[in-house]
A protein has these predicted regions:
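Transmembrane-cytosolic junction motif
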Residues: 1-14
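Charged, low-complexity intrinsically disordered regions
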Residues: 11-257
Length: 257
């Protein structure tokens, strides 16, 4: 990706148009100020791009996270005539890059924690444990049963089941998933996930921000998800508790010049 100030950097033009600040290749420990998914999905990570500003009157943040994970597979076995037995070959390790484009909007009032993320395979979690891929949420726990709204794709966790089911409905997850393309009408986002945490609406997908249309769509999805929140959620004591777990966006220590 080109740097700001050079021709052909649409995301820099996008940031300038909205008055957002941006920083390239920032230290990954900036994410330590943002607990929970998706900022800590994998232990090995880098941050190629970070942006912050206001969107529709709300504090906003956009971050491209580049995770890397190791995949180990056993080597093939062969018969050794000298040993008179089958021998296992050396295991093979490959590296996989996982792109995560994330936007955050901060609402005026908090709501309880709710995470709608990809449903993971238990055997995959165990294999990932041996490869030291995850340092947090190493094994995905039991989720909230939202019935057909999960599409057998999403894992839902957080506060009360009643709250989760009020937000996560079959029509909404079908819209969000859209046969794996995501809900954007003008680009393919892939699988889209979200999290409500105190005042924060966090939305992420497997795209970076080379094409600013990804940013526009993720921010639009965040606004749509805000409309899904039932009024009772703002009165729930769990809302204030979730809000205490994170730093307000304007108070984050961000590496802007």
């Amino acid at each position: 990706m080109n740097q700001p100030g050079q021709p052909g950097v649409p995301v820099a033009d996008w940031a300038q148009r909205l008055g957002w600040r941006m920083a390239w290749n920032v230290p990954d420990n900036v994410l330590d100020q943002l607990p929970g998914a998706p900022f800590h999905n994998y232990r090995r990570r880098s941050v190629p791009l970070l942006m912050a500003g206001f969107y529709q009157g709300m504090p906003g943040l956009a971050v491209h996270i580049r995770f890397s994970k190791k995949n180990s597979s056993p080597g093939s076995s062969h018969y050794s005539s000298s040993a008179g037995m089958y021998m296992n070959g050396a295991s093979k390790t490959s590296k996989q890059v996982v792109t995560c484009g994330t936007v955050v909007l901060e609402m005026p009032s908090p709501v309880p924690e709710l995470v709608v993320e990809e449903k993971r395979d238990k055997l995959g979690d165990i294999a990932s444990l041996f490869d030291f891929n995850r340092s947090k949420n190493v094994v995905q726990g039991k989720g909230i049963d939202v019935g057909p709204a999960s599409l057998n794709i999403y894992h839902v966790s957080g506060a009360s089941p009643e709250y989760a089911r009020a937000v996560v409905t079959p029509d909404r997850t079908r819209w969000l998933y859209n046969e794996g393309r995501g809900p954007a009408p003008n680009t393919t986002l892939g699988k889209v996930h979200f999290r409500l945490s105190g005042r924060k609406i966090i939305v992420w997908c497997g795209r970076n921000f080379e094409d600013p249309v990804v940013l526009d769509n993720l921010l639009g999805i965040a606004q749509e998800i805000q409309r899904w929140i039932p009024p009772a959620a703002y009165q729930d004591p769990a809302a204030a508790e979730a809000d205490r777990q994170s730093i307000p966006l304007p108070q984050l220590q961000l590496p802007f010049v």
